């Protein structure tokens, strides 16, 4: 478990992180989102012990990061955006070197390295120089070093940046596999990745925690209204007449041109996020207007992110 209480980080007169609090539990993958300059990187550096907070407290399984840093850091595995690799070492040499730095007992070192290689599927590359590895496998080696010692908390900063689509899928699957045994914090600018991989999402803006919850919870909270795309066989006056009696509808737009199948493309905007597809279908059926298709446009995590950061983006701080 990692907990932050009223964390503040200032650089001179500039406040990068402003009274940030959170409590993260093992067994979940947390997505950490924020626009450039939101204070995200500064917060992650404090979580991992690279920076000390100006005030406030960060504890790892009850150990204070400032008062007992060695014990607190022993629970953390960290993959920075650019993995700290040595190109002239083989994969195995590098992992054994990191295992020694982490003070893993020499008798356990070989088994720990083998376990990390197995989890990240790099065992067949153990004798290869790191300089000869692809970007995807370099990321795997970086993740393997984070897993050495089986730390309870895994912190990943932009783990799929620069990877090709197949490599991205492989790394995401690997991250998902860590969930049962670890607490995983994933920082990413790729909102679809966070939505797909993470159990909960934290959104930070101007150094403050603006939202935390599951993607579904945040999408429901910020839904506001719903939009429906409907293909209908009929004429514009008939459609508008049928829908005019529904109190939940705010606006109806009808395309000027019919589709190839002769249907009208109708966009319906409602006053709330409540699902009224059944009411729409009944209203159209009551005047014998066939509905070929009806889809509800869902609120996306991207929509939530833009709304949350936009409400705070009023000439505030530029944080790191």
Regions found by a protein language model. Name each.
Residues 121, 250-255, 290-295:
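A short linear hydrophobic-aromatic micro-motif
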Residues 26, 124, 232-234, 270-272, ...:
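Non-catalytic surface loops within mature trypsin-like serine protease
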Residues 118, 180, 245, 285-286:
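The C-terminal cap of the DNA-recognition helix in HTH/winged-HTH DNA-binding domains
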Residues 2-4, 9-211:
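ABC transporter nucleotide-binding domains
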Residues 173-186, 190-271:
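ABC transporter nucleotide-binding domain
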Residues 269-320:
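C-terminal coupling/interaction segments
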């Amino acid at each position: 478990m990692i907990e932050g209480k009223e964390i503040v980080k200032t650089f001179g007169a500039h406040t990068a992180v402003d009274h940030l609090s959170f409590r993260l539990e093992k067994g979940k993958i947390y997505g950490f989102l924020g626009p450039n300059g939101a204070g995200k990187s500064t917060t992650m550096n404090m979580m991992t012990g690279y920076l000390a907070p100006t005030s406030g407290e960060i504890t790892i399984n009850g150990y204070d990061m400032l008062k007992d840093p060695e014990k607190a850091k022993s629970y953390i595995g960290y993959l920075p955006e650019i993995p700290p690799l040595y190109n002239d070492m083989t994969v195995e040499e590098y992992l054994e070197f990191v295992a020694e730095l982490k003070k893993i007992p020499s008798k356990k070192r070989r088994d720990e390295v083998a376990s990390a290689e197995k989890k990240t599927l790099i065992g067949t590359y153990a004798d290869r120089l790191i300089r000869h590895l692809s970007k995807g496998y370099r990321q795997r080696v970086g993740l393997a070093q984070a897993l050495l010692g089986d730390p309870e908390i895994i912190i990943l900063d932009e783990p799929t940046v620069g990877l090709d689509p197949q490599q991205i899928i492989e790394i995401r699957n690997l991250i998902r596999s860590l969930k049962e045994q670890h607490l995983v914090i994933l920082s990413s600018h790729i909102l679809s990745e966070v939505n797909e991989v993470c159990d909960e999402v934290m959104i930070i803006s101007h150094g403050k925690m603006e939202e935390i919850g599951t993607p579904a919870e945040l999408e429901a909270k910020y839904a506001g209204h719903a939009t429906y795309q409907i293909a209908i066989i009929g004429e514009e006056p008939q459609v508008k007449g049928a829908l005019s009696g529904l109190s939940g509808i705010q606006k109806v737009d009808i395309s000027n041109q019919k589709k190839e199948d002769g249907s009208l493309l109708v966009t319906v905007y409602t006053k709330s996020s409540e699902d009224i597809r059944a009411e729409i279908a009944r209203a159209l059926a009551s005047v014998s207007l066939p509905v070929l298709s009806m889809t509800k446009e869902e609120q996306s995590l991207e929509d939530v992110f833009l709304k949350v950061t936009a409400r705070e983006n009023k000439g505030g701080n530029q944080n790191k």
